[in-house]
């Protein structure tokens, strides 16, 4: 993962704003719009899985059992569960989550073989090319600062 000099004061401000956004969302977590028992939510999840399968095929990642994946912003671990369902092996999965409570939820839901790293993704110190895939799903929709988005994208690349 590439490095770029980081202005820690700007980073801290945006990181705190992300934390506050997720705090506000907690109140809505049990809203019907998130329930997989709602057919439209369930169909959306299925479409996401179909898109993931298409991407795996187009990126020529199959077979996936030996692919190493890092997910930035793993939340409660739903994407990692989906990857395992498609054949990715837990010992080859690593997750990063900024928010402590979400990282703990992921730890409780996911197999112990999955490494979960708590904290800011910009602070990750992982060897170059230690992953076949660096994945994020909705991280950039939670970060509104363009410069911070750029730094994170560079880090992931």
Please provide the spans of the model-predicted regions.
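N-terminal, positively charged/glycine-rich alpha-helical extensions of SAM-dependent methyltransferases
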Residues: 1-35
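Class I SAM-dependent methyltransferase Rossmann-like catalytic core
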Residues: 32-47
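Conserved alpha-helix/loop element of class I SAM-dependent methyltransferases that forms part
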Residues: 45-65, 82
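Class I SAM-dependent methyltransferase SAM/SAH-binding core
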Residues: 70, 76-123
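A conserved beta-strand element that flanks and buttresses the S-adenosyl-L-methionine
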Residues: 135
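Short catalytic micro-motifs in class I SAM-dependent methyltransferases
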Residues: 138-142
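A short glycine-rich, Lys/Arg-flanked "PGG" loop and its adjoining helix->strand segment in the class I
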Residues: 150-157
